[in-house]
Amino acid sequence: MSRHRDVKNLDLDDYELDEEPGEEELTEEQEEEFRSAVATVRETLLGVPISEKEIADTVWYYYFDVEKSVNYLLQKASSKAGAKEKQNTDSQKEKKQNKSKEALADAKDPLDESSNGIKNLSLNKNDEPAFQTNGEVKMKNSSESDNQPEKKKIKKQNPTDLVSVPEIFEQSNPKPVVHLVVTGHVDSGKSTMLGRIMFELGEINSRSMQKLHNEAANSGKGSFSYAWLLDTTEEERARGVTMDVASTTFESDKKIYEIGDAPGHRDFISGMIAGASSADFAVLVVDSSQNNFERGFLENGQTREHAYLLRALGISEIVVSVNKLDLMSWSEDRFQEIKNIVSDFLIKMVGFKTSNVHFVPISAISGTNLIQKDSSDLYKWYKGPTLLSALDQLVPPEKPYRKPLRLSIDDVYRSPRSVTVTGRVEAGNVQVNQVLYDVSSQEDAYVKNVIRNSDPSSTWAVAGDTVTLQLADIEVNQLRPGDILSNYENPVRRVRSFVAEIQTFDIHGPILSGSTLVLHLGRTVTSVSLKIVTVNNKRSRHIASRKRALVRISFLDGLFPLCLAEECPALGRFILRRSGDTVAAGIVKELC
């Protein structure tokens, strides 16, 4: 590889690769290193408006250095966004000068709408993780000693404003709330299954369902009508795949189910990880039709990777929905064949207990064996429960609602005279009139309203609940997905590095000490550097497949909120990926 010109502040738009006849060609190892670096940068900058050519040129120029490439491309995107923001700011400056703080909160802001852009990236190591909204990259400055707030802009919490949520919760004897994540290979029928369940339970009326049937048929996708209840965007419907976690709720006689329909395509694995990170149980959907099961499970499909991820993220019980068995004439032999293969894999390879793996044959499109039994030929040999009955038999884990509050944010948007966030209470409890603290922005906020598990009449929520909070005294651009809200007195820590225990999967090539990887923790996706401490309790410079290692992981993009796995499992478990492949799962052991 030829040496590049030593030019400061080089603009890669003006840079062209030398193509002189005598230039040295890349070796196979260098080509693999180049491809790996490009893939890592692309995944890290997911959502930033940067072309594939810009990424490749930058990686080439920086000799495959991922960190330098990411920083350069972020700087370039930030410059473009900064120019646009300055123009917007200047045009409104005079109007905003004499407005009160309350009027400012209601003013139209160029950052009002949330987007699916990248989160938690920054330009250099002394900056707070960057985030993107409406295509604009914003930066937040930070220091290492800012876990505690320096000042409060609203009054100190008055205990008389609050009630004892744990006591109220225990006395209310509520119906259990269960969080399910539905996973499986693309086109296995996950969204169709959930849509059909919602229709059967009366969550959508016949008139609305008929409208969806007509729309799907007119688009040449008649069999997708139930899936369209969850796949609501134009792109998802056009492509016929779920691209982000679709959330929905339904209720049986025994439980309330909060459902996350995880993407099945490997391009959207980060959405699957986000959906599974807070789930109590999982439903793994497999397509039993001829060749499709083999393609999704045996031929490097996503079913296997999803199973590994589910167990790594702490899910210990799983229901396997053997879908489309009607296409196999409700064959008992086909069901048993799939059951034997999948159960052997889940128990022997992934680590599920035999008693925690359940199999249910279904047809999502016809609704057979989802809610109730019918006259299908299935019941000539199948005597087990319906899918909903199997789910109702699962015992939800106890919720840590008396611990300090830890509330993970999924989405943020502006609402009239306030800011609205959606997320999940991972530990503790939250209520109206409470003061919350966001360690990432060093800002506090006042809870005006709480919607608990889609119930607008609620005034509080506890660990395990999905919530929508209406917040006052904070701006929409001061919060972002991946942030963790806590009590002002017991804030979550924000760190630059941590010690973790990881378990590698079957990987192509060892993980070397000093490697740059992509860390997934809930909605947070960011680049990290990994240094090996020990491998199987021995010193080593690399980690091979199926090894347990103690490592030190450092964030490359500033400080991040983090919890020990023993204190809050949902916020202390993570996944490591490299070049588009999942390479390891880990738990946080020590904050540095």
UniProtKB/Swiss-Prot annotation:
- A Pfam family matched in the record: HBS1_N
InterPro entries documented for this protein: GTP-eEF1A_C, HBS1-like_N, P-loop_NTPase, T_Tr_GTP-bd_dom, TRAFAC_GTPase_members, Transl_B-barrel_sf, Transl_elong_EF1A/Init_IF2_C
Q: What is its EC number?
A: 3.6.5.-
Location in or out of the cell: Cytoplasm
* Family annotation (PANTHER family): TRANSLATION FACTOR
Q: How does it assemble?
A: Component of the Dom34-Hbs1 complex, also named Pelota-HBS1L complex, composed of dom34 and hbs1.
Question: How is this protein named in the record?
Answer: Elongation factor 1 alpha-like protein
